[in-house]
Every structure is written in structure tokens, then in C-alpha cells.
Design a protein with these regions (language model features):
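Walker A/P-loop-proximal flanking segment of P-loop NTPase domains
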Residues: 1-94, 103
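The catalytic "switch" region of P-loop NTPases
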Residues: 6-41, 76, 180-184, 197, ...
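Short, flexible/disordered secondary-structure transition segments
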Residues: 53, 120, 284-285
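Glycine-rich, histidine-containing beta strand-loop boundary motifs that form or position
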Residues: 60, 91, 150, 246-248
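Residue-level signal for short amphipathic helical patches enriched in basic/charged
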Residues: 65, 96, 221-224
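P-loop NTPase nucleotide-binding core
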Residues: 70, 75-202
Length: 293
């Protein structure tokens, strides 16, 4: 199947029709930059690694074809059964309207398991139960939500900065009681997280494949959402059989880290989450001049 047409206008006003490549066939003739070699390199790492969770990152500049590569990657995986990998694509930029990336990621995996029909229903039910418990805990642990809830709406989430003018002695007592309850329930929260992670481990028993989650546009997503997503992967999704490929412009993403955490070593911080870094093979300058991205 041929790709769509993209019409561009040059400086002289002449319209140029560029045939957008069809990415649904994987690395076929559309692979003009010979990036299938990188595909095989990543696949071999996934296949040869133990079941422990892995996090890869693809770092390159904007416009160099990262999205094209990962979509071809996914298509290549889908057209061959012998890779023993399921690939799921997730656009962080399109989903950053959500308050917490946990829901985004967990619902993605739930849908993946549910697509296996009867075989995946039992595991899907376990995952859904875990999503509800862990998700509600995360929601309650969010200070803005918690204060809004226990104040009966007196303190709205957009007025947290003026909290000193609102809290009364009675409300202060409610806040203290809420904090005490959260402290007492910490062990239950840990159990909920452990149960959720155990349910994720069962995905591979349903699919017989490792699951690769490709997270694209991480550097373009809302900074707090993108950084929370990293934390969620590390603490909640780091289980046997799950592999992540984070797609970003590293330099830009490190600026988001510095903006949130101040004067820290952003590069070292990022390396805490990522096991292997990759970059795209350099493109031919002549092809680049012709408009290929």
C-alpha cells in the first residue's frame, strides 16, 4: 500500500508533492536510511536478556525520523511471529492531558491483555483490580486532591497556594486525621503495588511473548507528566516480561528535569532509569536536502 501525499510549497511558490512512506510494512523499501540494522540490534537485546524489565531510550534531534523509525519497528514486529515480542505504541504528547500517567500505561496493558479474549480475561481482571487500588492510592496521595477532598471542596486545587488563609482549627484536625490514616495504610498500599506488579508478570503467560511498550514524544509531553511517567515505570511497571523504549530528544528532556529539580545532574538522573541508549544511523545529506525526514 502506498503512503499518503504531502504537498509542500517552495520559496518560489512552486508546489512539491512528496509521497509519504507507508510504514505499515515495516522495514521494506521505505527504509531509505537502512535503519533495520538498529531494529535487529534492539530486538536481539530484548530476546537475549533475562526476563527482568529493561528500559531503552532512543535519543535524536527533532525531525530526524524517530517516530518513523518506531512505527516501522512496530509494524515489523507485527508482521513476523518469530520475534516473540508484542509491540505497543504510546504517544506521551497526545496523552498528557491526563493527570497521572499510571492510568495511561496501565490501561494500555489492560487493553493488550483483554485483546487475547478468553485466554486473557483472568489476567485482565487481576490487572484491572490492581489499577483501581493503586490508582486510588496515587490519587489520594496527591496533596491537591487530598486537601480538596477532606475539606469538602472548601479548598479547591487551584487555591492551594492560599491555604493558610483557609484552614481552620476544625479543618486542621481533619487534615491531621487524614495524614494519620495514610500512615497507617502504608503497608496496605505496598501490598496493592506488589499485587499489581505480580499481575503484570502474568501477561507473558497469556501472550507467550515479551511486551515492548514504545513511548514516543516523551520530550514534547507536559514536563511534569513526562517525569512522573519515568517514575511510574521504575516503581510500578518494572517487572519480568515488560520492556520500554523511550523516544526523546535527550537534550530537551534534560531541560525539563532541571526545571523541576533545580541544580542537579540531569544526565545522571536520567541514567537511573535507562539501561541502554540508542541513536538513529546518520542520514545521507543529499536525501535530507530532498526533504526526507
Amino acid at each position: 500500500m502506498r503512503g499518503s501525499k504531502n504537498i509542500k510549497t517552495g520559496r518560489d511558490g512552486m508546489k512539491i508533492v512528496i509521497q509519504e512512506p507507508d510504514l505499515s510494512n515495516g522495514f521494506d523499501e521505505a527504509d531509505i536510511f537502512n535503519r533495520k540494522k538498529l531494529f535487529h540490534q534492539i530486538v536481539r537485546l530484548i530476546q537475549s536478556s533475562p526476563q527482568k524489565s529493561l528500559v531503552f531510550a532512543l535519543d535524536d534531534k527533532w525531525g530526524n525520523g524517530k517516530t518513523t523509525f518506531v512505527k516501522m519497528f512496530q509494524s515489523e514486529i507485527e508482521k513476523e511471529d518469530n520475534y516473540a515480542i508484542d509491540a505497543i505504541y504510546f504517544d506521551a504528547f497526545e496523552n498528557d492531558y491526563q493527570s497521572d500517567p499510571f492510568i495511561s500505561l496501565s490501561s494500555l496493558l489492560y487493553s493488550h491483555v483483554e485483546s487475547k479474549k478468553t485466554k486473557g480475561k483472568k489476567v485482565g481482571d487481576k490487572i484491572l483490580s490492581g489499577i483501581k487500588k493503586v490508582g486510588s492510592n496515587l490519587l489520594l496521595n496527591g496533596s491537591k486532591f487530598a486537601l480538596t477532598a477532606i475539606s469538602g471542596g472548601i479548598i479547591s486545587s487551584n487555591k492551594i497556594d492560599g491555604i493558610g488563609e483557609v484552614i481552620t482549627d476544625s479543618l486542621k484536625s481533619d487534615v491531621e486525621g487524614f495524614i494519620e490514616d495514610r500512615i497507617k495504610s502504608i503497608n496496605n498500599e505496598k501490598k496493592d503495588i506488589n499485587d499489581f506488579k505480580e499481575s503484570l508478570k502474568e501477561i507473558i503467560t497469556v501472550t507467550n511473548n515479551k511486551t515492548l511498550i514504545i513511548i514516543d514524544e516523551l520530550d514534547r509531553a507536559r514536563p511534569d507528566y513526562a517525569l512522573d511517567l519515568l517514575e511510574r515505570i521504575k516503581h510500578l511497571f518494572s517487572v519480568d516480561g515488560l520492556v520500554f523504549l523511550l523516544v526523546m530528544n535527550r537534550e530537551q528532556f534534560e531541560k525539563s528535569i532541571s526545571c523541576r529539580y533545580g541544580n542537579i545532574d540531569s544526565r545522571m538522573y536520567l541514567n537511573k532509569f535507562i539501561h541502554y541508549w540508542f541513536s538513529l544511523p546518520k542520514k545521507n545529506r543529499i536525501l535530507q536536502a530532498c526533504g526526507f525526514r
